[in-house]
């Protein structure tokens, strides 16, 4: 980081994480911070074991839990995905979903 306390995502290149899912990733004090974008109709095929906290910048994201159930977070809402419940994300909407995600 060039400016103490600032996380400069603009200096990163997009990384393809899954079909229709890409991310700008930074490591900040040992934690993974990412701007994640899900194209309309995209999702992750595998369940994730890592816990996350996040905020929906635009669009809408649905998280499905291996234990059953789902949550839907819309633009302007935050979410918490615990490490003890496997989960995976989907964008069932017609516009891209853009999120700020911090791994915990």
Segments predicted by a language model, with ranges:
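Short acidic-glycine-tyrosine-enriched beta hairpin
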Residues: 67-84
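Short, conserved beta-strand element in jelly-roll/cupin
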Residues: 38, 47-63
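Short loop/turn motifs at secondary-structure junctions and domain boundaries
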Residues: 16, 27, 44-46, 63
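A short, N-terminal "cap"/entry segment at the start of jelly-roll beta-barrel domains
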Residues: 1-36
